[in-house]
Amino acid sequence: MLTLTRLDSAQPDFQARLARLLQFDDATDASIEEAVATILHAVKTRGDAAVLEYTERFDRLPAPSAASLELGAAELAAALAGLPEDTRAALEAAADRVRRYHEKQLQGSWTYTEDDGTVLGQKVTPLDRVGLYVPGGKAAYPSSVLMNAIPAKVAGVAELVMVVPTPGGERNALVLAAAAIAGVDRVFTIGGAQAVAALAYGTETVPQVDKIVGPGNAYVAAAKRRVFGTVGIDMIAGPSEILVIADGSTPAEWVAMDLFSQAEHDELAQSILLSPDPDYLDAVAAAIDQLIVEMPRAEVIRTSLTNRGALIRTHDLHDAAAIANAIAPEHLELAVSDPEALLPKLRHAGAIFMGKNTCEALGDYCAGPNHVLPTSRTARFSSPLGVYDFQKRTSLIHVSEAGAQTLGRIAATLAYGEGLQAHARSAEYRLTHK
């Protein structure tokens, strides 16, 4: 029998116990930081030569030149053509849904004109070039390609450069096919911190990008953190999370499997169930014990649920919503009979899955919204990856002669108050009646 943490929001020490449950040490190992710093410096100063050395060392992939590590469009097309018909259809259907959803996020430029003829506005511009990191080797994450690449393309990014490690030369056809479907422009078979460095600084062969997105291991995360400022990054993601609020109307087996869906990612993933019904919590616990023996990743799930999972009894659904807001989970499932009634109470979550038919796994692959979501309580101030992450906004100011008279006097007064005489004089030069 799996031992799960059981909490009750009525307990005097509930908040302290919940805080301990949510604690996660995201400090990067000093040896990783040191190794990443060395790799970044080498690639920054030595370019292609360093990339080739690290690719041979870490991926066991010797290459005569950095150019030979680039895959041509024909290879991506061949990977797509070689897929089983049902797999290709599923990828294309998912891509279409992701594309249609993200097209709703497009923002355009705008202006307005004041009474004196002054025009103010905002110019929205896509980024020029974006780098996409995709885990490679035996791990197949075609969904990650779609979720990162499609919003960039919808935003109008001119060039999307994907890096994907191929340990021992092992290429993943699903990943390459997804790149073809998503419209990735260039693909390099490099990975790790050296790939992040190549994208951030540019080499003789790999072009420098403006922003790097996509998941990776601890070395990739450390590298992204270090190059931020030279380039933009999407986020530094923590372990996967799911929080389920249930009223007992959803079969216990369904909710148990939903908890598994995040727990199977890794031992640090967090799966929590909130319910005011203690009998239902018992039923889910029993379902967990019954179903876990069927799972290929049972040991990972068991470790995750034992160390970081919890079944929490709440006073009512409103109490559950308040706890959910404090946790600010990556994925929030509302396994309740009336999710619309509960929705106004919820403020902080990466994505909200409403109703018993809406399992989190659908959002991971094909519902349409992005599966790149804030973790580790950052949903309190962060949003899912979207088209807006690949656009930037520039303020527009076109002051008329009449406007310069009013604004010039205001600006000069404030500038003199701050002791910035050149600012003040610059505004005063535009005054026709001084």
From Swiss-Prot:
What cofactors does the UniProt entry give for this protein?
Zn(2+)
> What's any GO biological process attached to this entry?
L-histidine biosynthetic process
Q: Which reaction does this chain catalyze? A: L-histidinol + 2 NAD(+) + H2O = L-histidine + 2 NADH + 3 H(+)
Metabolic or biological pathway, per its Swiss-Prot or TrEMBL entry:
Amino-acid biosynthesis; L-histidine biosynthesis; L-histidine from 5-phospho-alpha-D-ribose 1-diphosphate: step 9/9
Sections of the chain in a coiled coil: none
Which EC number(s) are documented for this chain? 1.1.1.23
Q: Which residues bind Zn(2+)?
A: Q262, H265, D364, H423
Can you quote the record's cofactor note? Binds 1 zinc ion per subunit.
Q: GO molecular function, one example?
A: NAD binding
| GO cellular component, as recorded | cytosol
Q: Which UniProt keywords apply?
A: Amino-acid biosynthesis, Histidine biosynthesis, Metal-binding, NAD, Oxidoreductase, Zinc
Pfam families for the chain: Histidinol_dh
Active site location: E330, H331
Positions annotated to bind NAD(+): Y133, Q194, N217
InterPro entries (alphabetical): Ald_DH/histidinol_DH, Histidinol_DH_CS, Histidinol_DH_monofunct, Hstdl_DH
Which parts of the sequence bind substrate? S240, Q262, H265, H331, D364, E418, H423
Broad class of enzyme this protein falls into? oxidoreductase
Protein purpose:
Catalyzes the sequential NAD-dependent oxidations of L-histidinol to L-histidinaldehyde and then to L-histidine.
**Which HAMAP family did the record assign?**
HisD
Query: What's this protein's family per the entry?
Result: Belongs to the histidinol dehydrogenase family.
Q: Which PANTHER family match?
A: HISTIDINE BIOSYNTHESIS TRIFUNCTIONAL PROTEIN, HISTIDINOL DEHYDROGENASE HDH
The name of this protein is Histidinol dehydrogenase
Gene source species? Thiobacillus denitrificans (strain ATCC 25259 / T1)
The opening ranks of the lineage are: Bacteria, Pseudomonadati, Pseudomonadota, Betaproteobacteria, Nitrosomonadales
Q: Which gene encodes it?
A: hisD
